Amino acid sequence: MFACQHEAVVPDFLVLAKGLTGGYLPMAATLTTEAVYDGFLGDFSELRAFFYGHSYTANPLGCAAALASLEVFREEKVLERVASMVPVLTQELAQLRLLPCVREVRQVGMMVGIEVGAADGTGFDWRERIGGKVCLAAREYGLLTRPIQDVVVFMPPLCVSGDEIRFGLEAIGRAVEAVCG
């Protein structure tokens, strides 16, 4: 479920937000190891308590929405569904890798970064904002996405179908060809 699990990393802190409530209410949580938690455990007089909080934590309505969202996540077997869509995404990305201006395609699960560069293998001048131009062109083909410099981000919702994956990647491919030649 978390990126750190794909890398076999056990963090001391894990910060969660946005998706906890399925996007319905603001909610955030900070998870820690038992050792970190114990470091803050104590009476007020010991000055060990972690005095911190904000409107995105411990809100009863947000907590209820988060629990309901997690229940739907389990009931609808979202992780199992995602596991069946990852191979579809991986297979469809093969076509993008063939484009001369696609330098690299990086994928972890359903998260993809498509780096664009000149056909000769060099990068573009960052001031040209080619990634942004590709994303603007993708709108013409029906896809809203965003760049991180010259990397086009493709992160479909976890309820995506194979046809929708193909549609999105086709739009990116057409946009890359339109902008980069």
Language model features: what each stretch is:
Residues 1-181:
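Conserved N-terminal phosphate-binding loop of PLP-dependent enzymes in the Aspartate aminotransferase
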